[in-house]
Amino acid sequence: MGFQRRAAVITGGSGGIGAAITARLKHDGFQTVVLDVTEPEATVDAFVRVDLSDLDAARSAAAEIANRFAVTCLVNNVGVVMPAPLEAVRAEDMDRLMNINLRPSIVCAQAFLPGMKAAGGGRIVMNTSRVTLGKELRTLYSATKGAAQSMARTWALELGPHGITVNCVAPGPIGTDAFWRNNPPDAPRTQEIVNHIPVRRIGTGEDVANAVSFFCAPEAGFVTGQTLFVCGGVTVG
């Protein structure tokens, strides 16, 4: 039968970039299911409140959704940053970021793969980051996002025969609430950031959601194992 838009699960889909992704996939015709610790900003078909860093809770939530919905799309979006210079990186912080930024991707994929295979296809998208190319104060964050990109390429090879594609979107500077708190619009530092972006603007959650929408479309079935940088040209400028 091949891939069809049925239910899409978005981890960390309640706010920021995740909310934009959730809204776009809803617009595209998916049922949308959000796994997060806070209520979603967007209209969704189901919301499960869960701390995805808790392994047992994550497994339980994913199993619940797999039983309730025909999941053919998974967007692994949940993540935290925790910037720090190398000298200040702590082992416990490494565990925390791996448990939030990476492990839920595996837990959720394992829960939804049987349904995707039975349906004849699926879409998995990782929300990574341009920091995989290098950025100061991002030792742990870049490690987890780089691992996600490598994992996506491995999964693309394993799952391709089942009609399941696996790709990454890697945002650059995106105007989330956290970004604007740290970089007020009228601050000189913010203008410096804009001046270093070839398209001369800060990205939006919708820019990232557009890229996710492409990877989750039936027409994207011949694209897998790829990373699309949504960065306004920063990675090449």
Give the positions of each predicted feature:
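Conserved glycine-rich cofactor-binding loop
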Residues: S14-G15
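Substrate-binding pocket helix/loop in short-chain dehydrogenase/reductase
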Residues: P85-L86, D93-M98, R189, I193
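Active-site loop-to-helix junction immediately N-terminal to the catalytic Tyr of the SDR YXXXK motif
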Residues: V89, K135-A143, T154
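Short, small/polar-rich loop/turn modules that mediate ligand/substrate recognition or access, typified
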Residues: G160, T165, V223-G225, C231
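Active-site helix of classical SDR
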Residues: A109, T144, A152
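Alpha-helical segment proximal to the catalytic Tyr-Lys
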Residues: P114, L157-P161, G221
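Conserved NAD(P)H cofactor-binding loop of Rossmann-fold oxidoreductase domains
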Residues: N77-M82, G233
